[in-house]
């Protein structure tokens, strides 16, 4: 098996078919002829990524498809224009994610899965922009590693996966666990149904995916954190998964002002910045304290100077929070 590589080492080449000429009415981009391929960099056009043949037509799901989708003149360095409400967006992280995904496909490894059938998508066209991206666990325990499902935020107006779930999943994979990023319909109820469907899909295909289903976790930022809390607390079956689908061992939540408790909430880790104008750290702290008072294991962190949507918190006081969260989850399994 080919080793996986970081963006600094990856020799991933964009398709020789060239750069984007235009966009069709359904949002699918086309190719222009004559441009040379090159390595993934900050200057790589986003549409070159979307239309890369290695991505088999689902490249569009790497980026927002609803609110502020990318335009044909944007490069990876322009991604922040597509991600309202987010901060600490690092182009190097984006390049790392794209390089990883293309290198996986170049090595003929599958990482995208439809969670709905063709018949279901034909009956409900909104399901076309859903799916599950897998970042496979690396290291000796990869063949039997546990899994986490990460839901990006976006205010239930779009899915900010390239900043708020893909980097998390890649970090988890490099830490020896399976990370799955769900691309969902931007509506609170439908998003939870898509997350529950993703969880049941993983359980149903556990052997094919080589994952350990015991003690899994749900992660999310902002709106995605609400999804993790709702599906984690009420259980996947409450949102359409088969009856008996287990609840997660832990919910990992970033920057959400949610304060709803279900009475069956899993162990919960939460973090937020003290300058978040969307999710009050005091509200989050009060929620975690109330949950802890019921005997549920909790851990809470507030980071000085950070605003909403800091993702991995690269080069900030929050950097490394994901390793703390991973340790918290493992302690609950």
Ranges and model annotations:
Residues 1-15:
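N-terminal secretory signal peptides and thylakoid transit peptides that target proteins
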Residues 14, 23-131:
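N-terminal targeting or regulatory segments adjacent to alpha/beta-hydrolase or S9 domains
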Residues 145-153:
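Short beta-strand element of the alpha/beta-hydrolase
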Residues 162-179:
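Short amphipathic alpha-helix adjacent to the substrate-entry channel of hydrolases
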Residues 197-264:
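Primarily recognizes the serine-hydrolase "nucleophile elbow" in alpha/beta-hydrolase
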Residues 270-272:
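Short beta-strand/loop motif that positions the catalytic acidic residue
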Residues 275-279:
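Acidic catalytic loop of the alpha/beta-hydrolase fold
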Residues 296-333:
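C-terminal catalytic histidine-bearing segment of alpha/beta-hydrolase fold enzymes
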